[in-house]
Amino acid sequence: MVFFACSTILCAQDDSKWSLVREHQQKSFAHTIPPGNYSGITPLGDDVYAMVSDKSDSALYFNVRLYISRQTGELLQAEYLGPQGRVDSVRLDNEAIVRVSDSTVVIASEGKHRLKEYKLDTDSIDNGLWEWSMPSADFYPNYVFESAAYDTVHHRLWTVNESTLRRDGKPATTQDPHNNVLRLIAFDWSNRNASPVSYLYKMDMPTTMKMSMTYVMGVSELCALPDGKLLVLEREAFIPNIKLGAFCQCKLYVVDPEVETPYALDKELEPGAPYVSKRLLASWRTKLGLTKYLWANYEGMCLGPQLENGDQVIVLVSDSQDGYAGVLKDWFKTIVIRKR
């Protein structure tokens, strides 16, 4: 759970070709977007985006139209277009969605520990489409798959476990601070029968050691950039018993898998194992204040439009837990980046 009250973006000194141009303040559209548990988003074209809700036991996804300025990248308005498709089971806890072809999307289910391909714009379920899963025993509770991204350059589908797998240690906490070790997992979409390729990813250390009521630290989403690099969204959410003082630290990193060394998914961690390099693109921290309830637990991220000058918009969406207590909102945020 994450509470937002203020936001500051910090640019990092890195040697990657992507840099931050500007951020826009988060916005909610309570009059046009109904409360939900929106945890993933992907573009469908013509300013339409599909979003999954991790609590939906009926609709597969929900379409919205986002009106984003082609000059500045600011999100101007959002329009709800309604539910689409139907789920093939209950308690799927769908956390991420990504378009992988003109007619299909892949959805990451935390409840089923799987990634599964679905047809767009239909209520029928084709069980002959691609599906992949891992044993539930590999994961700690609520730390499964929260991410999905598709690289159109190299035709790869990406995901990552939200926090440390059991074989790799324990998830970091405020009382046991350490670097979570994750497995970035890539599937060759031109040869889907091939075994996935994985890479070791090391998260940053926790920024607090205070006692908490709720503490969540993990990668909440991936996004493939137009050149095949990956954006990795690290999220640290700290909530004390009194709620005041709660914060969420979000860090957006760029990773270039093309220059990294794979590490087998089923291989135990060994001393000297290769971790991918990461470069900080942006960082923001949000807090719960006495009078401001700008909660924004960002769990969805995807490419937005390119601006008239060629800059790239990144769209983020938060999970309001269905407008929890009438206070939390479904926030949207856009940032603009540039390849130099």
Model-predicted segments: where are they?
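Sequence/structural signature of beta-propeller domains
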Residues: 13-340
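Bacterial Sec-dependent N-terminal signal peptides
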Residues: 1-17
